[in-house]
A protein has these predicted regions:
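Short beta-strand segments within Ig-like beta-sandwich modules, predominantly Fibronectin type-III
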Residues: 106-114
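Short, conserved beta-strand segments of beta-strand-rich sandwich/propeller modules, principally
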Residues: 125-127, 208
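Disordered, acidic Ser/Thr/Pro-rich linker "stalks" and the adjacent N-terminal cap
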Residues: 139-203, 214-223
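Solvent-exposed segments in extracellular or luminal domains encompassing
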Residues: 115-124
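Short proline/glycine-enriched turn/loop motifs at strand-loop junctions of beta-rich domains
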Residues: 91-97, 203-206, 224
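Substrate-binding groove of N-acetylhexosamine-processing glycoside hydrolases
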Residues: 1-98, 104, 148-161, 168
């Protein structure tokens, strides 16, 4: 058995030395922090502030480190009290500002400064970036959100979903599209026929109903038809 900490990299997926460095750093710095810092002295904010200097060292040594630390995390959710869909932005990077734009890939200090959740009333793509002292620290991140008349609504399935990992009970109306690489966004049914009833918030006209389905034969997942 292993006493202490352990970090694994699955070599069969690593094709170049540069990709190995990308997968290893700054994760090895975090592992060292966990192992060598006494519990009473562990402080994530302190570690995050010290990463700036560590990235300078890695750059000087020519290490191809992953810089996701300087990117924006985007999350969307239905605000029941405000009855609106909101996108929240955050970053692990301390003492930094987040600038964003909706449906505009150009993000700079002239863009909107993020201070409160961003309300959306229709399909939109949010672009965002981290800045400090007017200088960009990372890449522009983007995420698309599906906002429509069903977003945030309750629904029932007959029969019930067989598998639903995230936002149970709202996986179909949470404003997030499913992607092949992220199984958590999908819900599954094992039966041939499914009835889904969406409770719209008020009487309104519906012109079109659309949905996505996943096809992954290796996992015995077949598209709806």
């Amino acid at each position: 058995y292993i006493i202490g900490v352990q970090a694994n990299i699955w070599g069969e997926y690593i094709q170049t030395p540069e990709y190995f460095e990308y997968m290893a750093f700054p994760r090895l710095l975090a592992m060292s922090e966990v192992q060598w810092t006494q519990p009473e002295h562990k402080d994530f904010e302190s570690f995050a502030r010290r990463l700036d200097k560590e990235f300078e060292r890695l750059d000087y040594c020519g290490v191809n480190a992953c810089r996701n630390f300087y990117e924006v995390n985007q999350a969307g959710a239905w605000n029941k009290s405000q009855q609106t869909y909101e996108v929240t932005l955050n970053t692990f990077c301390p003492d930094a500002d987040i600038y964003y734009a909706v449906n505009d890939s150009t993000v700079n200090t002239s863009s909107s400064l993020y201070e409160t959740p961003i309300p959306l009333d229709e399909d939109a793509t949010v672009y965002s970036a981290v800045y400090r002292s007017g200088k960009p620290l990372g890449k522009v991140t983007r995420k698309s959100f599906a906002v429509n008349k069903a977003t945030g609504c309750d629904y029932t399935c007959n029969p019930e979903a067989g598998w639903e990992h995230l936002n149970k009970g709202f996986g179909l109306t949470d404003g997030r599209r499913g992607y092949a690489r992220d199984m958590r966004r999908w819900i599954s049914f094992y039966q041939d026929t499914v009835q889904i009833v969406v409770e719209l918030k008020k009487p309104q006209k519906v012109k079109e109903v659309a949905f996505s389905s996943l096809w992954r034969p290796v996992n015995e997942i077949w598209p709806a038809r």
